[in-house]
Amino acid sequence: MKKTLVVLVALVVLASTVLFAEGVQEKKPYIAVVSKGEQHDFWQQVKLGANAAAEDFGVDITFEGPPSESDVQIQVEMLNNAMAKNPVAIALAALNTSSVLDQLQQTKNQGIPVIGFDSGVPEAPEGSIWANASTNNYAAAGMAAEKMFEVIKGRIESASIAKPVKIVVMNQDASGESLLSRGKGFRDTMIKLIDEKTALSKSDISVIGNTAYIASDSPTKGRKVFIEMIVPASAAMTDATNAAQAVLNKVSSDNILGIFCSNEATVKGLLAATNDGATLKSNATFRDMVVIGYDAGAAQKNAVRNQYFLGSITQDPYQIGYKAVELAYKAYKGESVSDVDTGAKFYNYQNMDDPDIKGLIYD
């Protein structure tokens, strides 16, 4: 009887040990992913990529972002809450480049790796951002300028002081690094193309509008070509639509040749103001104006397919999310990490169904 009891006790202890060990093994590293939002299709694709990486690398993640990309303080609170959960690493897409500096100093002091995604944090404390997973936004927007220039070059060359022309760049805000880079990339590339490939020069160009997008070396005295940098009153859809409508109201008077919308929100604003883009072709006032968008979504894809837009720039949001979590995991494991360019491509009605493009343009 005693022998049987000893055996039973031993079995119970062994079973408890096994269960305890399994419990320990099942505890996964936790990575906090703090996004700029979840409201746009773009962020849903980023989230899918992040979740896939979490599955592949055996980590638990939370993915959260504020209701609107103007809710900077809400994002800061989300980051604070995530830090309180003791993550092994953090992936961050900062809405405002200066709003999270204190938190980044804390993570650096605590040795918590932070990976930037979608946009960087230029003023971040040195060493606090371990790597970034993002599109080269400056180059991607430069691609948009090149595509637009091909179509409007002749009309630019015809510009005069008596009849100047205007190119409009619509940016959702003037604080996010990704949008700032896009606006500046389009601006600089268009200036370079006009200066090098037409009879005009930089002295004929003026960059006007939101001062965050006017560099110290931007031409501001020209009177033949105006590049206007527009930022809506807020990131709200109504403000994006109102800003787009204000531009459309001046197409004839300002001789606007083209509009570049630098993200999905500004695209949606323009589409809302033009009956999903149909007015851009049905109204003779807009028919010769060139529009290029950014990212995708069902409505934007439809505008490209129907040639309301010349085309759009697509990123790879799935890879942005995936690489953000992958880099965060590798940093936690002590591996060396570096910036990853997740790429961008121009798509139009002719190539949007090609295999290398189709998988990037989400609905």
Annotate each predicted stretch with a short phrase.
Residues L8-S16:
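Bacterial N-terminal signal peptides
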